[in-house]
C-alpha cells in the first residue's frame, strides 16, 4: 500500500470527527450573534445579565472539561462525542423554549441559562472526545512517523 493511499484512508476516517466538531461549534457560534440582543431588547434585561447568560456557557465548559476527559477514558471517545452532541441539541431545545416563553421573561431567561449550561457541557464533551477520537483513529498508524520527526534517533 502506498503512502498516498494510506493518507487518503486516514483523511476519510477523520471526516466524521470533523463533522461532529463542526456541528458543535456551529451550535456555539450561531447564538452569539443574536442572544445578547434578544436578552436585552426582547426580554428587557440589562446588558450585564446578557453577559452573564453568555458567560455561563464558558464557565460550564471550564468545570466540565475534566469530567469529559475522564468519561472519554472510561466510555471511549465515540460515546462522549455523542453525549456532547446530545447536550448541544438539548441546549437548542431550551433556547427554543426561551423563545416560546418570551411573554414570561423570568422563565425565558431561566431556559436560556439551562441551555447555556448544556451547551458548555456539550462543548467539553464534543471537543475532548473528538480530539481523542482523532488520536485513536490515526494515532497508531501515524504515531511512529510523528515520533521520528520530533525525536531524532
Model segments located where?
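Residue-level signature of mid-helix packing/kink "hotspots" within the transmembrane helices
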Residues: 58-66
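C-terminal ends and interior cores of transmembrane alpha-helices
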Residues: 86-105
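Cytoplasmic helix-loop-helix junction between adjacent transmembrane helices
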Residues: 115-153
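Helix-to-coil boundary motifs at intracellular loop junctions of multi-pass secondary transporters
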Residues: 38, 42-43, 74, 133-138
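Small-residue hotspots at the loop-to-helix junctions and early N-terminal turns
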Residues: 47-51
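Pair of pore-lining "gating" transmembrane helices in MFS-fold secondary transporters
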Residues: 9-37, 41
